[in-house]
Amino acid sequence: MSLINEKKDFKIIADLIPANSSVIDVGCNDGSLLEFLKEEKDINGRGMEIDQQKVQLCLSKGISVIEGDADLDLYDYPDNLFDYSILTYTLQATKSPKNVLSELVRISSKAIISFPNFGHWKIATSLLIKRKMPISEKLSYSWHETPNLHFCTINDFIDLCEEAGIRIEKQANLKTNRLNKFYGKNLLNSYFNAVSYTHLTLPTK
């Protein structure tokens, strides 16, 4: 991801989180988002990351982090331990997205999820014209090397939340930088105006 898109991405997430919130970033990578949220919102943050080298990088920055797997290790946390849980660009790489979502809204009051929207018009056009899986800045792996297991569209994600009994509160996207109250499925949002990543806030049941 480019630095410009990363800044826009972080800003959208920061706008969803009140100051001084307790936050867990699941799949926190090198801890850059937690650093940004600490600076902008003075959060009490901690991370979970499956890659040991990235865990060490977080620790070298003074970030509280544990080595863990979203599919296996969220069960260890008690209910409502955090104000917010964050899962950015990781949902599609989990083995059981439904279980992970359910755990995120169990351990926190609200969750913020971002994922590549496989229904975006550029992806659909690439599949239609080239008849090949798309490769881009946001989807940079060849199909046989990708860590991604479960691609989905925005509408697929909405259906999953309904099935899991999770309420979507707001949506945002990188193209407009706007936060919108969620009113249900929208063709423009899911195909024409949505970029490849969409952010959703899910309150607990």
Model-derived segments and their meaning:
Residues 99-110:
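A short glycine-rich, Lys/Arg-flanked "PGG" loop and its adjoining helix->strand segment in the class I
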Residues 140-155:
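Acceptor-substrate binding/catalytic loop of class I
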Residues 84-95:
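A short SAM/SAH-binding and catalytic strip from SAM-dependent methyltransferases
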Residues 4-20:
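Conserved alpha-helix/loop element of class I SAM-dependent methyltransferases that forms part
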Residues 113-135:
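Conserved class I S-adenosyl-L-methionine
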